[in-house]
């Protein structure tokens, strides 16, 4: 579980996040939704430690991120998997080398152990027989699957996905959504997904938080989002 308490962030005097409070639950897909420029990407970057908030707390389990020492932060990073918007695969590395990459930094496993774990992760995302291929030889959907395999390589407790459907056709988007949801439940991860895709929200949104102009205006689930008591959210739903 991750708790966010009264989080605020500004850039050049402009407040981008305003007193955000939200809880992200374990074993569920927790969605951060909102229009472009609403602040959802800034919130995601604060959650994973790429930015520091001006005020407020981010609590992983029972430990505040701001109060962790460097050793504790390193331990936390080992428990975080990230699926970047563009998959962020290394073009110079093969599929299996991409998946093994985080293991080289955070484990003392032998090359054989790393390869075995990478193959297991690739099987989990239904990528078989592509170990020696390079990312540019694969479709966007396959690249996304490999990105997910790399994100779960260290068996993380927390999974963050930034616009996982970006650049995908509707059918492939559904498959990727279901894969993220299935892995979340199988490994009991706390998964946080940043998206503006309504199909994705309705497909896997166990918990949903709507951000508008830096404020968390509404929280609910996929059962209640189509009849919200929030005018700004109604506009967002109609536009998407």
Q: Where does each model-flagged region fall?
A:
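Helix N-cap at the start of a conserved alpha-helix in ABC-type nucleotide-binding domains
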Residues: 170-172
